[in-house]
């Protein structure tokens, strides 16, 4: 069987992770990387060629699945429907509140072109979403809890870096251990935002910056920190470079419910990741395989992780899966 031919749009942390993940899957090959930058300035780790993103349309006969590696704020809302005109696509759109409208926009383009587009792939949305559905279906009487961390939040880190006087910064989301244990114990607590997570900032200041002023701006920032207990730590650039340049993340989905007359049941799924973008990339590549198979079977339109059987993610045949993993 010929390899699944993959293209990548965008060559940042996620795009580089997808490139590496493809190399770990023998049934796939990377055909091309598409970038908004001058292709001659982009050095890739594989043998794939690099092209301007505007030239992608010319490759519709050479690529089975295009993996879109842009950001959710401005890139994917435009790129999702755009590339669905010509390719089966995978993306990691993660603005939860806007997923329904994004789905509709991509679906309209994919239905028209006859392509398959799997949106909002990754771990949240993605694998966590699947486990929320599983928990509700199996334990209809109960409560679902999602905890994130310990992990670096890129959006919140960017928000801190935009503050005047900040040279560099990262922000970690931390699940509050007492809250997690109460859920695991089957107490079904009603938890506020502040009771579920804390935020921790590590900040390098510009020379002469006003530390108390910066700290106050951080802890009172609406939509980011004002609803959380936030700790701000000021450190040197050397300490920052030594200890805070990784991109770890993770979390838990816990369904606490009842079955039978009064049996307490806990269903839990957890992740502990050294690299958020590299793990997300691996999920994207697995769903690229599924998108290709769905397309070959005559499917079209937008899909989410809820629409795709797990068996389609695996390179193994249905018979192998029944024998080895069932």
Swiss-Prot record:
Pfam families: DAPDH_C (PF16654). Disulfide bonds: none annotated. L-2-amino-6-methylene-pimelate is also a potent competitive inhibitor (5 uM) of this reaction. Glyoxylate inhibits the reductive amination of L-2-amino-6-oxopimelate about 30%. The enzyme is inhibited completely by p-chloromercuribenzoate and HgCl(2) in vitro. NADP(+) binds at residues 11-14, 35-37, 69-72, 92-94, 121-125. Its EC number is 1.4.1.16. Homodimer. Probably plays a role in lysine biosynthesis. This is Meso-diaminopimelate D-dehydrogenase. The lineage of its organism: Bacteria, Bacillati, Bacillota, Bacilli, Bacillales.
